Amino acid sequence: MTLLALLTLMQAMPLVPVPVPAAPPIARSPIDWAALPPLPYRRTPQPTTAMVNFVVTELRRNECPRPMPVKGRTQLQVDVAVLIGEDDLVRATIPRAIGCPTVEQYGAGLVVSFARGNLMPHFVNEGGWYRASLRFDWTE
């Protein structure tokens, strides 16, 4: 093919720009976590060793993002938004995304269990949303 034929062919074919894929939108939580009052426990629950071991195992097994250890200790906080019903029982939970759905759901389930019979009724508003925070702490 001659250069003239190649140039003629190129002129006949319009250049179509390749679309650049748009960056995915940054997911933002519709929950204002800082504005949620803490869930009013009678006795603040602490995760047991077995609970912590489960979280560590799930983080490894699912290749979830892990917090950086500080002086040989690692801490992971799981926040859960909690809706309390008129009977002072948990009606809904929404775990805060930490990049590990198994641990998020586990934390939400623990909050339901920890709240059962362990809330101060005179500090709970019917239909109110609260924040429960669980801290899993272990040695690397």
Question: Whereabouts are the PLM-identified features?
Answer:
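Charge-biased low-complexity segments
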Residues: 2, 11-140
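Intrinsically disordered, low-complexity protein-interaction/activation regions
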Residues: 6-8
